[in-house]
Design a protein with these regions (language model features):
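Active-site scaffold of zinc-dependent metalloenzymes
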Residues: 71-131, 138-149
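Short, solvent-exposed secondary-structure capping/transition elements
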Residues: 126, 143-152, 199-211
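Acidic/histidine-rich, surface-exposed loop or edge segments in extracytoplasmic proteins
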Residues: 15-22
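Zn2+-dependent metallopeptidase catalytic core
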Residues: 25-55, 76-78
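Pan-zinc metallopeptidase signature
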Residues: 199, 206-355
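Post-HEXXH active-site segment of zinc metalloproteases
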Residues: 128-129, 143-183
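An active-site-proximal "capping" alpha-helix that borders the catalytic cofactor pocket
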Residues: 185-206
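Short, charged/polar micro-motifs that form catalytic or ligand-binding hotspots
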Residues: 25-28, 119-133, 182-190
Length: 355
């Protein structure tokens, strides 16, 4: 299938050149105007390292993913909180936007917008959501600090282990993958999201980011109906004798943790930036409309993770970040062990990384 460029423009915002290439026509001009405003705002308030910004609007991220799979191992790229492993690239394909930049040369950055993902999420014609998303993506390179750099020296090692219950063996590879992704997000990559959100808030986009988070929480509430359908499907397996109630409880707990614990990375930065009103509004929505419908361990575990996110220092070494991450990992491992899952996971500092 051929890809056709339907819009090309070249603009100058202060000392920054903005180059726009789009496969989509509808809705692109308002998005470019928002992009101009964000570049202007950040470049006037803080150190802005970019002489140029490439702004790509793609119908989907298929071409980008093919390119990254070829080139990821050849450059020092920071992809908006992702490493570029196959699992991370697969997740990247469903993102509405991403900022890809070379950490060794911040003279420019590449913003990619995923048209289909934006449509699915309802963001495409929502100016506030677009502003929050773009401001967040541009904040990634601005938020680089000792702790975010230290995260690139850590890796997660998950030991193969037996499924806690024989009927779960067929699902255990998927379960282990979900948990590994969650641990990486909360214990290794957390700083990248926390500091990026904090820069976004302190850069003047707190209202737009809060509205974006409220919108996403509303979507989570809407999706609770899907969780109830899953409960019914699993109960049918219990009735057939394929699963026990304990096994169902473990599966639901893992799913709830994987979806909801990362919200701490979105809400804690409002506290860190002194915007407690927005943080309390988001937390109230969680506590009233979401947590009561989940496994009872999710709320307490979220509180522990969110408190740790508030305390994360910006000047951590790899060893210090590993220690911080292990505290969260130990709590997660302990909670899963109580439900019969013995997850063997370790955070390691790569040899030669600065301590």
């Amino acid at each position: 299938m051929s890809r056709t460029v339907k819009h090309f423009s070249l603009l100058r915002i202060g000392a920054t050149e903005l180059r726009v290439i789009s496969e989509v026509e509808d809705g692109v001009l308002p998005m470019i105007q928002i992009e101009e405003q964000i570049i202007q705002s950040y470049s006037q308030q803080m150190h802005w390292p970019h002489a140029w910004v490439m702004f790509f609007v793609l119908d989907d991220f298929g071409p980008l993913l093919r390119q990254l799979r070829v080139s990821a191992s050849k450059a020092n790229l920071g992809a908006a909180g992702y490493d570029l492993s196959p699992r991370s690239l697969e997740a990247l394909g469903s993102r509405p936007m991403v900022n890809i930049y070379d950490m060794a040369n911040l003279s420019g950055c590449n913003i990619y917008v995923n048209h289909q993902a934006m449509l699915r999420a309802g963001y495409w014609h929502d100016a506030a959501a677009i502003t929050g998303l773009l401001a967040h993506e541009h904040a990634h390179p601005l938020a680089e600090n000792d702790t975010t750099r230290a995260s690139r020296a850590l890796r997660l090692k998950v030991e193969p282990c037996l499924a806690p219950f024989p009927p779960l063996e067929m699902r255990f590879t998927q379960i282990t993958g979900l948990l590994a992704g969650l641990v990486e997000k909360l214990c290794i990559f957390a700083g990248r999201e926390i500091f990026t959100n904090q820069v976004t808030i302190e850069g003047g986009f707190a209202s737009e980011l809060a509205r974006l988070n409220l919108r996403n929480l509303s979507a989570l509430v809407d999706n609770l109906a899907g969780r109830q359908q899953l409960v019914q499907q699993l109960q049918a397996e219990v009735d057939r004798g394929d699963l026990t109630p304990d096994e169902v409880e473990l599966l639901l707990l893992i799913g709830d943790l994987e979806i909801h614990l990362p919200l701490a990375l979105e809400i804690a930065p409002f506290h860190r930036a002194g915007r407690s009103a927005e943080a309390h509004e988001l937390e109230a929505r969680l506590e009233k409309s979401v947590f009561p419908h989940l496994h009872p361990l999710v709320g307490p575990l979220y509180a522990v993770v969110e408190a740790a996110c508030r305390r994360l220092p910006a000047d951590g070494t790899p060893a210090e970040l590993a220690g911080w991450g292990r505290n969260t990992l130990d709590i997660l491992v302990g909670a899963l062990a109580e439900k019969g899952l013995n997850l063997q996971a370790r955070l390691l500092v790569e040899p030669g990384a600065g301590q």
